[in-house]
A protein has these predicted regions:
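Hydrophobic/aromatic beta-strand patches that form the interior of the parallel beta-sheet core
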Residues: 6-7, 24-26, 43, 78, ...
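Cysteine-nucleophile active-site neighborhood
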Residues: 45-112
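Short glycine-/acidic-enriched loop or helix-start segments at secondary-structure transitions
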Residues: 17-18, 53-55, 87-90, 137, ...
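Glycine-rich, phosphate-binding/catalytic loops in enzymes
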Residues: 23, 58-62, 95-96, 143, ...
Length: 219
């Protein structure tokens, strides 16, 4: 059976970026969560909200309920940024607001070896988040910075950073006055220049990772 790869869009400004073509994007606030198939492959994208903002963004409640069911059914899932936080919340971890923003390109500190992520050893990864999480029971932490960055649980892979980053995405996220205010103490220009200068390597690392992830046998 041929499976679809479906990206769940939690925020209209946080799209698939430099992920490969052929991914079907659907908006989380329009999903019929009660009838969403467990047999396809899913990418849970990021967003400006927190996992705990589910009273304001009520679709997050149903999304987390579906994620719990899907993870326990060994549905193949990749969570990115908010996606990694929703996954943690769904299966016994805790997503929460940290005391500061993590912004910019960072080196990962690997605490477990897993060849799936080897390409992220060769380049920095981009983070922009204030929310973080405690990984859920039964999960394996693979890499971290000051915060957890990669973990796996069952057939689910979670990344706090943004492997899909590209200049157009960054510009969309940075466009608001709120974003400019929260980053006023950071050297944003330097990070943008790094993105421009290293995009080919960043994209290569992401594509190599994605190819290994999408082709890996499900549990």
């Amino acid at each position: 059976m041929i499976k679809n790869t479906i990206a769940i869009v939690n925020d209209s400004e946080v799209t698939t970026g430099s992920l490969p073509d052929g991914i079907i994007s659907i908006n989380a606030w329009e999903v019929d969560w009660d009838n969403l198939s467990l047999d396809d492959t899913y990418i849970i994208l990021g967003g400006h909200m927190g996992s705990y903002d589910d009273k304001k963004f009520t679709y997050l409640q149903k999304e987390k309920q579906w994620l719990k069911k899907a993870i326990n059914s060994d549905t193949k899932i990749l969570g990115i940024c908010l996606g990694s936080q929703l996954i943690a919340d769904a299966v016994g971890g805790t997503a929460f607001l940290s005391d500061k923003i993590e912004f910019g390109f960072k080196d990962l500190n690997f605490v477990e070896e897993d060849p799936l992520f080897d390409d992220f050893k060769n380049s920095k990864v981009f983070s922009w988040h204030r929310d973080t999480f405690e990984i859920p029971p039964g999960a394996t932490l693979i890499a971290k910075t000051e915060y957890p960055q990669i973990y796996k649980i069952k057939n689910t892979t979670a990344l706090q950073f943004h492997p899909e980053i590209k200049l157009e995405l960054f510009e969309a996220w940075y466009d608001s006055e709120l974003s400019k205010q929260e980053l006023e103490s950071y050297d944003v220009k330097s990070e943008v220049n790094y993105l421009k200068d290293n995009f080919k390597q960043l994209e290569k690392s992401m594509i190599n990772f994605y190819s290994k992830w999408i082709s890996a046998n499900s549990l």
